[in-house]
Amino acid sequence: MDHIFSPIHPPLERLRMVCEKIVEEQREAYEEHGRVLGCPVHSLGAEVSTWEEALQTKIKEAIAQHHRYFESALRDAESQGLIPPIPDPATRARIASAYCEGLMMHARILNDLSVLDAMAEGVQMIARMGPVSS
């Protein structure tokens, strides 16, 4: 992930690349196991993190790192004028990450990789959303 989120790549390209990497990993797992496996971190977390504190801590760290990667790309995209101003980049990063995780969970439940086809486009749409007025 460090390579994908390196500042040598344009920020919106980083978001596209991570989505492509996720889809690629899911396709490889499907070819090997005959099933969509979804995100190993979230799958494991959903199963055992409520009763295994040490594991829960590790899972939280992994999720937080993923959010920081997304947030750095969003902040860079905003500072370069590639996306509208974001009042709360950390929240936007969590939304984008949750979108990816939701797609992976749906793909796993349905055992259908095509669910992931919209991931990169959806993350780009989330990145480009303007502020929500109240």
Can you annotate each of these PLM segments?
Residues 13, 57, 87, 113-117:
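Short, solvent-exposed positions on alpha-helices
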Residues 13, 17, 36, 53-79, ...:
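Amphipathic alpha-helical packing segments from all-alpha helical-bundle domains
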Residues 43-51:
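Short helix-capping/turn signature of helix-turn-helix
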Residues 3, 7, 21, 25, ...:
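Solvent-exposed, charged/polar functional surfaces in cytosolic regulatory/catalytic domains
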Residues 37-43, 87-106, 122-125:
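Hydrophobic alpha-helical segments that form the core
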